[in-house]
């Protein structure tokens, strides 16, 4: 099924001021080039590994809409980045047998962007809007009648001579993806008939994703190697696929082979400074500052940001969530505190207590 992509000005673009993180959840520049034609993306519910409850809900909804010959209800997918929201939207389009138009909220800043997207649709088409929480108020208000009543309400003319004109549009499905569902206006949230969360993946699902991806790029990976990779990818398929590509590069250059064993995985990821819990140099610097200079905390966020030379928002939204997820960090009213598990891991992986 053809995919029409209009992704521009995407916030998943890496920050030009900072270094791209191999284990960061945002898309890297090289991954943006792969776009929706990424060969590792599943094309059906059967190919999509993990998220079993979500898949069951969506399979029922898709089959029911096909049986009735109607457009699928508008769908909101939310959760941390890299878990497959875009992929799931494309899978749904394939299962429905319709075209998917892929865009993002920053590309829909002007009313004419929304109008141009909606008036050129075919019946039952799927429109995927990434970062939908970033839509401005005018764009959201244009979508209200489109989602609920299948019409566009446009203002024609200016001043006292202006008048409202309504244009009927075909039935369609809007799939909105967001990491911040609470940032959407209440009227916008209410217009989604289906709202589902994507969760972090367990090790078994990640192993299966890694094995599937390895097969698609003609690698032979051992059981132990896939297990080791699964431990390092932070519960995130996007990171799993990114790491397996880096391991492939290493194997082709140093082993001259497409066979991946655990030694190759360890050597490749040690080279990239990704340890056995998926922590990179940035994570270890954060923990190291707390352990070495502040005896584990509590320490204020701004103090940590100054000590690391990082923006406090970056620390709060990019670095800290995973450390909290694995039980290495606590946010308290007095500041940030590392846990005993974090101290133990840091001392084991950084013998000199410094990771510059």
From Swiss-Prot:
CDD domains found in the cross-reference section: AAA
Entry keyword annotation includes Repeat: no
EC class name: hydrolase
Region (Small ATPAse domain (RuvB-S)): 202-273
ATP-binding listed as a keyword: yes
List of residues binding DNA: 331, 336
Protein name, UniProt field: Holliday junction branch migration complex subunit RuvB
Species of the source: Prochlorococcus marinus (strain NATL1A)
């Amino acid at each position: 099924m053809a995919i029409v992509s209009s992704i521009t000005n995407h916030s998943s673009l890496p920050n030009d001021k900072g270094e791209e993180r191999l284990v960061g959840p945002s898309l890297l520049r090289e991954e943006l080039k792969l776009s929706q034609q990424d060969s590792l993306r599943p094309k059906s519910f059967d190919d999509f590994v993990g998220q079993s409850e979500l898949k069951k809900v969506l399979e029922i909804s898709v089959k029911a809409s096909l049986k009735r010959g109607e457009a699928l209800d508008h769908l909101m997918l939310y959760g941390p980045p890299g878990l497959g929201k875009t992929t799931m939207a494309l899978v749904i389009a394939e299962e429905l047998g319709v075209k998917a138009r892929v865009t993002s909220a920053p590309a829909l800043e002007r009313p004419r962007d929304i109008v141009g997207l909606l008036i050129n649709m075919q019946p039952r088409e799927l429109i995927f809007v990434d970062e939908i929480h970033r839509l401005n108020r005018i764009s959201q208000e244009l979508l209200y009648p489109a989602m609920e009543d299948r019409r566009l309400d446009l203002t024609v003319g200016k001043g006292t001579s202006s008048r409202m004109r309504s244009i009927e549009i075909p039935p369609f499905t809007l799939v909105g993806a967001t990491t911040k569902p609470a940032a959407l206006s209440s009227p916008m949230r209410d217009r989604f008939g289906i709202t589902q969360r994507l969760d972090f993946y367990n090790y078994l699902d990640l192993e299966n994703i890694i094995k599937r991806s390895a097969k698609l790029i003609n690698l032979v990976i051992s059981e132990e190697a896939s297990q080791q990779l699964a431990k390092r990818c932070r519960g995130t398929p996007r990171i799993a696929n990114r790491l397996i590509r880096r391991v492939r590069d290493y194997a082709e250059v140093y082993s001259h082979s497409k066979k991946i064993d655990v030694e190759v995985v360890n050597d490749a990821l040690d080279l990239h400074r990704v340890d056995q819990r998926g922590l990179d140099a940035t994570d270890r610097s954060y923990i190291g500052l707390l352990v070495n200079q502040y005896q584990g905390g509590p320490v204020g966020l701004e103090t940590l940001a100054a000590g690391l030379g990082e923006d406090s928002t970056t620390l709060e939204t990019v670095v800290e969530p995973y450390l909290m997820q694995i039980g290495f960090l606590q946010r308290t009213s007095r500041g940030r505190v590392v846990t005993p598990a974090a101290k133990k891991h840091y001392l084991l992986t950084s013998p000199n207590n410094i990771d510059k």
